[in-house]
Swiss-Prot record:
The keyword Transport applies. The lineage of its organism: Viruses, Riboviria, Orthornavirae, Pisuviricota, Stelpaviricetes. The record marks 274-275, 731-732 as: Cleavage. GO terms for biological process: proteolysis; symbiont-mediated suppression of host innate immune response; transport of virus in host, cell to cell; viral translational frameshifting. This is P3N-PIPO polyprotein.
Length: 977
């Protein structure tokens, strides 16, 4: 037997028998080389790795990976060999499903240097991938969609040349696909379901997901039309089988019909279809016969078309229960979850539309038309009188006390109309009962009209003012410390009080006059007698004619007494009369119906004695409110009272106006609502409320108002309060009618004084509105640059003032092109409304704000009164007054120009020229009236007059006027800069 010797790649055959020892050695050598070869093979398919210390090594591949690589190489070689051995074929068509991407190969440069441990591996850019979809990928997509549709019972539509629709449903056979067939829609056709090849191929992907349960043909019934079953799983005789799937149409002669197959006309007519319509009519007929009316007085006949009856039944169903399908559980759930109002509204809207259809198409069904009309028109009864509802809500909507609460409830229920439920109707009856009781009691009270049971006693408990009990506001003697409020109180004392000189005596201050009479103060009692008898006589005072409790002493609201707004009585019902109020010095006395509290006036005011001027008595109420106002708000409070409250109240205001103003102030400063009032005495004979200050009252016998705090006094601020005292006079500020004239005069003077004009624009900008008094003043302000300066001054702080200046500048341009004075005045008056709307912006601390708004409102009201007269073709007698006003203003301007020194004239011209340089154009009136000419003369003063004056007064005047920034040059006999 021949043996072979192997050493590496060297092989040699040996003759003869080999010994067993030599054979075992050769086998061992063979095993050694095979393991080395296998290890090298794994190294060859391995990858290069680097260790943490930078060393590079080859990581061998696994045996499994090597086997896969060898198998792939063997398969590639076999395929190539098979391709080469195959017979030649003719290729007539090549179809490329995927787009071929051509990538240019880059030239590869081989590294010639030796790789070291510091070699940096470069990253290779991955080629950009493009989204492509092959036929297999598209099949996978269809398969995934089919799985989702089956799991969620979704509807599927396949559209190519025609639309094929299907839906997965849960059946007794499992979850199956149902294809839409024609006979389910009421059409009997020879082909029940048309499906082209492309549509059928796609639909097969979804048919594969249908149930695979074995089904006997006799188990199929109504409602199974369109179900897709596997042909192999159907037991029974089948007719028209197309492929592996069977779409059920119906039966004919015990044969199951395929929906995609074409059948003869006779089979189509004789076939029993498995649609749900037959089931519906079976249930409909059964229930209709069971519930058929009994005791009819006639024999029923078939008079109306059956198809029309079906239409009407469907319309009735849609009007009562609007839905997409009567078998849809989701529609049923949606209708069940609607509230009554929404469901009724939905029914009503559908019923009204369906009624129109029934009247047009099915007029013979009069009973259904009448039923729907009566049912839904009665359910949709509404109250058309919404204007009355809004008016009631406006009058008493905010009142929650009886009987207004009952009226509001009735008003709301009546608005509901047919939506009112039985509970609401029961509440309406209860409210009506309460109204009847109230009216009955009110009638009885009015009929009696007696005050013998009226009692309004003073509370035995003293009012606790928290502002006077805070340790931080009391000194070591327990006296109230005003703090910063004391400084703000000066605004009251400086404007509305006058000082008393004790050296001149107190006689002239004893009598305080009011519009209806007078009252004696106790200020003369500062000088008292040491004789006890005479002192007791002084303490008696001087009594006025005393009156008892009358209707003027009480205040009612809703038929009930408002006790804080009534006069104080004793236990027997008689009025409590005021006694002598002794005077004190430098005190504020608060506490009306209880024990008085004496507060020292602020130490910042000095030790002078102050007394309110005639008509200013109610300022003591605001001074008492200042005690409870926080120190941080004291300054704003006093400014608001001075600039707004006192301006509106006027002289001797009524009590209702004072109470309303207190309510307004309490809104801005809530702490002031709990402030205690000064002593308030009621004089019914003179219809006056006396606000008693620290100088007391010599007269006695007045009634006492029970209101002790500002919040109680605010109850008078109501139009529904039945109180004669609400119209009593209190006291106020004498308004000066010369305020407008003073404002115009100040504005005119400021035009010729640039420094004054700048200060006026900064501190009282609203005075610029008074330029509407005259067209000449308006144009002069525009030429002087005042409006431009104002716009630049306020552009970042107050946009309303910027709009005001812009409107005035525009008006100046419009007025300059007017031909007559009347037309100029008309232009300014017509724009007053717009300017007023831009100007009014809540409360402003500027003193000129109130005057400016009042001036604009006056012009607006005059326009409102004159417009109907002018539109009717008449003229108002204003032209002559305008001419006179212009003459007076012209005379005033000339007087101002005469008084101006030459230095000021030159400086004014400099300012004008500087302003004109900025605004580039000067407004020149087309009609040069008297005032306009006077104002324009100042602008056009020639340089020779200045040069002559400079020669007389010296060069120092030139430096004073022009400074070091301006130089005077002669050019065309005018001054240029």
């Amino acid at each position: 037997m021949a043996a072979t010797m192997i050493f590496g790649s060297f092989t040699h055959d040996l003759l003869g028998k080999a010994m067993s020892t030599i054979h075992s050695a050769v086998t061992a050598e063979k095993d050694i080389f095979s393991s080395i070869k296998e290890r090298l093979e794994r190294k060859r398919h391995g990858k290069i790795c680097r260790m943490k210390n930078g060393s590079i090594y080859i990581k061998a591949a696994s045996s499994t990976k090597v086997e896969k690589i060898n198998a792939a190489a063997k398969k590639l070689a076999d395929d190539k060999a098979a391709f080469l051995k195959a017979q030649p074929t003719i290729v007539d068509k090549i179809i490329v499903n995927e787009k071929i991407q051509v990538v240019e190969a880059e030239e590869v440069h081989k590294r010639e240097d030796v790789q070291t441990v510091f070699f940096k591996k470069t990253k290779k850019r991955a080629p950009k991938l493009r989204a492509t979809c092959s036929s297999s990928g598209l099949d996978n997509l269809y398969n995934a969609v089919a799985n989702i549709a089956k799991a969620s019972s979704l509807r599927v539509e396949v559209i190519h040349k025609k639309r094929v629709c299907g839906e997965f449903k849960q059946t007794r056979f499992g979850r199956a696909l149902f294809i839409d067939v024609a006979h389910a829609k009421g059409h009997r056709r020879r082909i029940d379901c048309r499906m082209h090849r492309r549509e059928q191929r796609t639909m097969h992907m979804f048919m594969r997901k249908t149930t695979k349960t074995e089904v006997r043909s006799k188990h199929l019934r109504k409602g199974d039309s369109g179900i897709v079953l596997l042909t192999q799983k159907i037991k029974g005789h089948l007719s028209g089988v197309r492929d592996e799937f069977f779409i059920v149409r119906g039966t004919c002669d015990d044969s199951l019909l395929e929906a995609r197959a074409r059948f003869s006309q006779s089979i189509t007519l004789r076939a029993t279809h498995f649609s749900t319509g037959d089931i519906f009519w079976k249930g409909f007929n059964a229930s209709f016969q069971e519930q058929k009316a009994i005791g009819l007085d006639h024999t029923c006949t078939s008079d109306l078309p059956v198809e029309a009856c079906g239409h009407v039944a469907a319309l009735m169903c849609q009007s009562l229960f609007p839905c997409g399908k009567i078998t849809c559980k989701r529609c049923i759930a949606n209708l069940s979850n609607l509230d009554f109002d929404t469901f009724s509204e939905l029914q009503g809207d559908r019923a009204m539309r369906i009624l129109d259809v029934m009247r047009a198409r099915f007029p013979s069904f009069t009973h259904t038309i009448r039923f729907l009309h009566d049912l839904f028109t009665q359910r949709r009864v509404t109250n058309p009188n919404t204007a009355a509802f809004r008016e009631i809500l406006r009058l008493i909507g905010d009142r929650n006390e009886a009987p207004f609460a009952h009226v509001n409830r009735l008003n709301e229920i009546l608005l509901l109309g047919s939506k009112a439920n039985p509970d609401s109707l029961a509440k309406a009856s209860d409210s009506l009962l309460e109204l009847a009781r109230y009216l009955n009691n009110r009638t009885e009270n009015i009929r009696n009209g007696s005050l013998k049971h009226f009692r309004n006693k003073i509370s035995s408990k003293a009012h606790s003012n928290l502002a006077l009990s805070c340790d931080n506001q009391l000194d070591q003697n327990g006296n109230f410390l005003w703090g910063l409020a004391g400084i703000a109180a000066k605004r009251f004392l400086n404007n509305y009080f006058e000082t008393i000189d004790p050296e001149q005596g107190y006689d002239k201050y004893v009598i305080r006059k009011n519009p209806n009479g007078e009252r004696k103060l106790a200020i003369g009692n500062f000088i008292i007698s040491t004789n006890l008898e005479k002192l007791r006589d002084q303490l008696e005072g001087e009594s006025i004619a005393r009156v008892g409790i009358t209707e003027e002493c009480v205040s009612r609201k809703d038929g009930n007494y408002r006790y804080p707004c009534c006069c104080v009585t004793l236990e027997d019902g008689s009025p409590m009369y005021s006694e002598l109020k002794m005077p004190t010095k430098n005190h504020l006395v608060i506490g009306n119906s209880g024990d008085p509290k004496y507060l020292d006036l602020p130490g910042e005011i000095s030790n002078l004695m102050y007394i309110a001027k005639e008509g200013y008595c109610y300022i003591n109420i605001f001074l008492a409110m200042l005690v409870n106002v926080d120190e941080a708000n004291a300054k704003d409070f006093t400014k608001r009272v001075r600039d707004e409250s006192v301006q509106k109240l006027g002289k001797w205001p009524s009590l209702i106006d004072v109470a309303t103003e207190c309510a307004l102030l309490s809104t801005y400063y809530p702490a002031a609502a709990s402030a205690e009032l000064p002593r308030l005495l009621v004089d019914h004979a003179q219809k006056t409320i006396h606000v008693v200050d620290s100088y007391g009252s010599l007269n006695t016998g007045y009634h006492i108002l029970k209101a002790n705090t500002v919040s109680q006094l605010e109850k008078f601020a109501s139009n529904t309060l039945e109180s004669p005292m609400a119209q009593y006079k209190v006291g106020g500020l004498v308004y000066s009618e010369n305020n407008d004239a003073s404002a115009v005069k100040a504005l005119t003077q400021a035009i010729f004084r640039p420094d004054v004009l700048s200060e006026l624009i900064e501190k009282e900008p609203y005075l610029m509105v008074f330029a509407l008094v005259s067209p000449g003043i308006l144009m002069a302000m525009s030429n002087s640059g005042a409006l431009e300066f104002g716009i630049s001054k306020w552009i970042s702080s107050d946009h309303s003032l910027v709009r005001m200046a812009s409107i005035l500048k525009t008006l100046a341009s419009k007025v300059s092109v007017a031909d007559t004075l009347a037309l100029q005045k008309h232009i300014m008056r017509q724009n007053a409304n717009f300017l007023c709307g831009e100007l009014i912006n809540g409360f402003q601390k500027k003193k000129s704000y109130t005057h400016a708004t009042r001036f604009l409102l006056m012009i607006s009201e005059e326009n409102e009164m004159d417009d109907p007269v002018l539109n009717a073709g008449y003229r108002v007698l204003e032209a002559s007054s305008h001419e006179i006003m212009e003459k007076n203003l012209s005379r005033t301007v000339r007087d101002i120009l005469v008084r101006l020194k030459l230095v000021w004239k030159i400086q004014v011209n400099l300012v004008y020229a500087k302003a004109l340089w900025k605004i580039q154009s000067r407004i020149v009136p087309k009609r040069a009236d008297r005032l306009a000419r006077t104002l324009q003369q100042l602008v056009a003063v020639s340089l020779p007059e200045y040069a002559q004056a400079l020669e007389k007064q010296g060069e120092s005047v030139s430096r004073k006027i022009f400074g070091k920034h301006f130089k005077c040059k002669t050019q065309d006999n005018m001054c240029s800069f």
